[in-house]
Amino acid sequence: MPIPTPYEDLLRLVLDRGTAKSDRTGTGTRSLFGQQLRYDLSAGFPLITTKKVHLKSVVYELLWFLRGDSNVDWLHRHGVTIWDEWASDTGDLGPIYGVQWRSWPTPSGEHIDQISAALDLLRTDPDSRRIIVSAWNVGEIPRMALPPCHAFFQFYVADGRLSCQLYQRSADLFLGVPFNIASYALLTHMMAAQAGLSVGEFVWTGGDCHIYDNHVEQVRLQLSREPRPYPELILAHRDSIFDYTYDDVVVHNYDPHPAIKAPVAV
């Protein structure tokens, strides 16, 4: 059976048909608008194999989000530096993802834990069309070190299977998107386990889907490689989604091609 390659197919499409555009970083991109990728999570964990993805950073970043944290100190204690380019001298990033997920401020001065609210709906009203978590808090964007790229996600239950769709307004296809796919696939597994469900699909929807001009050669190298089978995720049991640790996440049979380095556009 052929290995599904929706991510690599999108890279090819943007290389072939992308529009040349300027961008905030001054780097320049090739870009397409409104693209979608689908992964059946029951068929394997979608960790890209045409280059090695740094799984440690994926896992620790997700755990950091789930903590409601927005300072890189906790990441540093675990050897993860992926947010350093945007952090202040004290390590602060403002009210980014984790803060919005766990502590969205209301006009009355209270805070909403969106992750807990989503889990409650999955358990009590799985057919709800309102099982949504948003990081795009317009009133707080000026205080964020970087406005959310992966901004909004929705859960959907059918036949006892949990699916998740993410909307990513800005998609750095070479560096960011493989990371985002793995992160939200892992989150879907965690939410499914906590709600007593099996996993369904992860659906990634991208707005501005771009390849930076200084990533083109790296993308061509990646596309020259033969995809390999996706690995298997083994997730330990925890009583709460907020109790997971790095050691609870085990990926078996991940056999990627070597990593490919590229500069981050800041």
Curated annotation (Swiss-Prot):
PROSITE patterns with a match to the protein in the record: THYMIDYLATE_SYNTHASE (PS00091)
Residue sites binding dUMP per the record: 24, 129-130, 169-172, 180, 210-212
GO molecular function: thymidylate synthase activity
Any one GO BP annotation for this protein: methylation
Active site: 149 (nucleophile)
UniProt-listed Enzyme Commission number(s): 2.1.1.45
Organism: Mycolicibacterium paratuberculosis (strain ATCC BAA-968 / K-10) (Mycobacterium paratuberculosis)
Family as reported in the entry's similarity comment: Belongs to the thymidylate synthase family. Bacterial-type ThyA subfamily.
Record's keyword annotation contains Mitochondrion: no
Record's protein name: Thymidylate synthase
Swiss-Prot/TrEMBL keywords: Cytoplasm, Methyltransferase, Nucleotide biosynthesis, Transferase
Entry binding sites for (6R)-5,10-methylene-5,6,7,8-tetrahydrofolate: 54, 172, 265
Taxonomy, superkingdom: Bacteria
Catalytic activity: dUMP + (6R)-5,10-methylene-5,6,7,8-tetrahydrofolate = 7,8-dihydrofolate + dTMP
Function: Catalyzes the reductive methylation of 2'-deoxyuridine-5'-monophosphate (dUMP) to 2'-deoxythymidine-5'-monophosphate (dTMP) while utilizing 5,10-methylenetetrahydrofolate (mTHF) as the methyl donor and reductant in the reaction, yielding dihydrofolate (DHF) as a by-product. This enzymatic reaction provides an intracellular de novo source of dTMP, an essential precursor for DNA biosynthesis.
Enzyme class, first EC level, given as a word: transferase
Subunit field text: Homodimer.
Pathway entry: Pyrimidine metabolism; dTTP biosynthesis
Keyword Transferase attached: yes
Subcellular location: Cytoplasm
InterPro entries associated with the record: Thymidate_synth/dCMP_Mease, Thymidate_synth/dCMP_Mease_dom, Thymidate_synth/dCMP_Mease_sf, Thymidylate_synthase, Thymidylate_synthase_AS
Cellular component GO terms, alphabetical: cytosol
Database matches in NCBIfam families: PRK01827.1-3, PRK01827.1-5, thym_sym
